[in-house]
Every structure is written in structure tokens, then in C-alpha cells.
Amino acid sequence: MSFPCKFVASFLLIFNVSSKGAVSKEITNALETWGALGQDINLDIPSFQMSDDIDDIKWEKTSDKKKIAQFRKEKETFKEKDTYKLFKNGTLKIKHLKTDDQDIYKVSIYDTKGKNVLEKIFDLKIQERVSKPKISWTCINTTLTCEVMNGTDPELNLYQDGKHLKLSQRVITHKWTTSLSAKFKCTAGNKVSKESSVEPVSCPEKGLDIYLIIGICGGGSLLMVFVALLVFYITKRKKQRSRRNDEELETRAHRVATEERGRKPHQIPASTPQNPATSQHPPPPPGHRSQAPSHRPPPPGHRVQHQPQKRPPAPSGTQVHQQKGPPLPRPRVQPKPPHGAAENSLSPSSN
């Protein structure tokens, strides 16, 4: 490597080291200032009193070496944009802080002779404000929880009746084993904000949690609604089935009645004699009187046997008198002897 190249490299290295040392020194001597995201902040110059000898006050960002505001006598105050506002006492106001406003700010003050009478550096850091912590507990699990939802680098602290219990970042969980009745306080904070919540907690040794009671009531209500719907559904199905069966029975009865009406026979006249055997008996011989039937039974061996006759079917719609039991036997008719023969038979006896 040639001598000119070595000289340039050495110069750049020395300049880089000196620049880093100056920046580190500025950060070390900087005043740490905290701002809340979305809020305004005033960068006040400590131990400074405005006088007529002051001619120039200049503010700049050290990250880009850019002038953001300047005050000079008998001249209009300079500001880079509406975000900044410079007061006559040298205070710089930054409106509606954003994350990119986090930087190192430097103020330089000169008198009318051009002499630097004061120089201050501010290390501005921005955080999001913490939200109010939320305290919740359950008596069944004997557990209390404190948590914070929003905020940059929050710090939680839990107290019971003024006694510090735990420290955490986002969530604190506390358990107990006996009955409890105490006042809990949970605080959340960071560099720019602080919030707290207080809750009186009362848990008997054998108590029911309000959420358990609500769950039981809700489950019971749902069960009752389900049972009512089930009963309604079953009843409706039974009614539909009964109505369908009634319609089927009515249709079947109508069909049977129609078929019977089509098969009905014609009426038969009821002029048939009840005992045809009497009509077949031969008439008595001439000259003989028929004797009235006596009530004596005929001698044995001479009983007339009548064969049963088939009765004609009774016509529909008419009532036919039917004789109960077998037909009664008729007495045998004997012919009366002639009158002359009777006299001849009586004469010898008289002689």
C-alpha cells in the first residue's frame, strides 16, 4: 500500500473513533427526559435565565444534525414544522409525540458577541401510557389475578390490606388456602404514567362463586327449554300419526262398504211351507172321517221318522220365524171300521 493510501486510512480511522467518542460523551452528559406517546412535552433549559445579552438560541437533532428551531434577536423565529414551538425563554415544545420523535436533542445559546454561553443535551425517550389494571378472582380456585393490557414496560405491584405481596410486568397471580376477606390494590406504572385499582374480596370457606351460580342457572334453563321442545315434538308426531291412522281406517271402511253393496243378493220370497212332510201325506179314503190327533204317543216301533229338511236361506232384510228344536212327531191315523160290521159283531154276543 502506498503512503497516501495509508495516510487517508489513518485519518478516517482517527476521525471515526473521535466521532464515536464525542457521541458517547454527549449521551453520557445528556439529560434523560421521558415523554408520553401522543402527548405534548416541553424541553426546559435548566439553570438558564433569558437576558438582553442573548442573541441566538438554536435547537437541533443530533441523529441527523438538522436544525429544527431557532430564535434570534430582531428576526422571526424559525421552526422546521408545526410540530415544534420555541418560546422566548428558550424552551422547546414538541406536540403530539410520535415514536420517531425519540432522539437526542441539543440546544446551543450564544450572546451578542457570538460566544457560546450554554450548551445542553436532552435524551428524549417515549413510552405508551399504561392502562388501568384489572383485578379478577374466583373463590372456587382461590385465585386472584391482576393484569394490565396497555403500556410500555409496565410494572405491576399487588398489595393486600396495604402489605406488598408481589411485583411483575404484565400479570400477577395470587393464591390463598383459607377463607379470605381483604382489600386488594393493584398498581401499574411506567416512566410516564401510573394507574391503580382497588377491590374488596370476600370468599367464605365453602362459598359458591357467582360465575358457577350463573353457569348452573344457565344450564338448567337450557335443559328445560330442550325438554319442552322434545315434549312438543313427540306430541306433534303422535297427533300426526293418529290423524293418519284415522284417515286410513275411514278409507278402508268406505272401501269395504262399497264392496259389500256390490255383492248383496236379491230378496227371496218367504212363501215356503215350514214342514213339507205334511203336504206329502196321502189323503184319507172316502167315507172316513179324519180323527183329530190325540196327545197319546204312538206305540213303539211304529214312530214315524221324519228326515230333516234343509231350510232355504233367509232373505236379507226379512225376519223368518224359526222353530226351536226338532219337529214334534205326528200321531198315526187309524181308519174307522164300517157301521155294518160293527153291528154284526155285536149281534152274536146278544144271542
UniProtKB/Swiss-Prot annotation:
Residues 25-209 are extracellular. Disulfide bonds join 139-203, 146-186. Expressed in natural killer cells (at protein level). Residues 106-120 are annotated as: CD58 binding region 2. Residues 1-24 form the signal peptide. Residues 269-280 have a biased composition (Polar residues). Residues 326-338 have a biased composition (Pro residues). Residues 61-75 are annotated as: CD58 binding region 1. GO terms for cellular component: cell surface; cell-cell junction; cytoplasmic side of plasma membrane; external side of plasma membrane; extracellular region; Golgi apparatus; nucleoplasm; plasma membrane. It is found in: Cell membrane. It is a single-pass type I membrane protein. It comes from the Eukaryota. Keywords: Cell adhesion, Cell membrane, Disulfide bond, Glycoprotein, Immunoglobulin domain, Membrane, Repeat, Signal, Transmembrane, Transmembrane helix. Residues 25-128 form the Ig-like V-type domain. GO terms for biological process: apoptotic process; cell surface receptor signaling pathway; cell-cell adhesion; heterotypic cell-cell adhesion; immune response; membrane raft polarization; natural killer cell activation; natural killer cell mediated cytotoxicity. Residues 243-262 have a biased composition (Basic and acidic residues). CD2 interacts with lymphocyte function-associated antigen CD58 (LFA-3) and CD48/BCM1 to mediate adhesion between T-cells and other cell types. CD2 is implicated in the triggering of T-cells, the cytoplasmic domain is implicated in the signaling function. Interacts with CD48. Interacts with CD58 (LFA-3). Interacts with CD2AP. Interacts with PSTPIP1. Interacts with FCGR3A; this interaction modulates NK cell activation and cytotoxicity. This is T-cell surface antigen CD2. It comes from Homo sapiens (Human). The gene is CD2.
